[in-house]
């Protein structure tokens, strides 16, 4: 348990439960890579798009696995910032910080696989669907997520590929930690 003090000396107890360990994430990433290979074979007509900010770690890791462990050469990877396409970006008290979009290929008539860490309400994916149209009209769009919070949807969006499904209360948050950013791979359920 973690105790947090906020102003006026009010203490809150924050609990953190591990959902996936580093080893479990490793196994899931290889399974997801194999599922992508089954459906996209050589990736000749497929591009992967990591949704900024946290989906990029998952996307980069999957590309590394595809290229290094399964010898799929030159998998096309783009990074998509959806900040100004979100339907809630003007409703926040603090301004949102935009990330970088880096898509240096044409998505016209390509199969696009959106990649994000957690599917929650579906609003990020709706924003990504709008944002990708600036880069062309894909022939097909699929969704890959590490964690699917299945009973939390606000929009009718479902993943084509999921690492794990979890049912958590609304007051709980799924927190994905990546080695590259957080020092280790793990997924936690945290009480807000």
Question: What kind of feature is each model-predicted range?
Answer:
Residues 130-192:
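PRPP-dependent phosphoribosyltransferase catalytic core
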Residues 72-112:
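Short, glycine/charge-rich flexible loops or terminal/linker lids adjacent to PRPP-binding catalytic cores
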Residues 33, 61-69, 131:
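Alpha-helical structural signal in soluble globular domains
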Residues 103-133:
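Internal catalytic-core helix/loop-beta-alpha segment
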Residues 11-45:
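Active-site-facing substrate-recognition patch
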Residues 43-64, 122:
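Charged, well-structured alpha/beta interaction segments
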């Amino acid at each position: 348990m973690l105790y947090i003090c906020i102003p006026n000396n009010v203490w809150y107890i924050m609990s953190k439960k591990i959902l996936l360990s580093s080893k479990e994430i490793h196994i899931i990433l290889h399974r997801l890579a194999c599922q992508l290979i089954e459906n996209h074979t050589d990736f000749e007509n497929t591009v992967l798009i990591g949704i900024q900010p946290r989906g990029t770690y998952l996307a980069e890791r999957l590309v590394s696995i595809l290229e290094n462990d399964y010898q799929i050469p030159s998998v096309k990877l783009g990074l998509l910032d959806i900040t100004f396409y979100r339907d809630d970006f003007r409703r926040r008290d603090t301004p949102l910080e935009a990330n970088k979009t880096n898509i240096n290929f044409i998505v016209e008539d390509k199969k696009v696989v959106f990649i994000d860490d957690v599917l929650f309400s579906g609003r990020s994916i709706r924003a990504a669907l709008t944002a990708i149209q600036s880069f062309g009209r894909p022939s097909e769009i699929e969704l890959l997520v590490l964690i699917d919070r299945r009973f939390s949807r606000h929009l009718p969006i479902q993943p084509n590929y999921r690492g794990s499904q979890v049912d958590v209360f609304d007051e709980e948050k799924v927190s994905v930690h990546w080695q590259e950013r957080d020092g280790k791979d793990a997924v936690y359920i945290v009480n807000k």
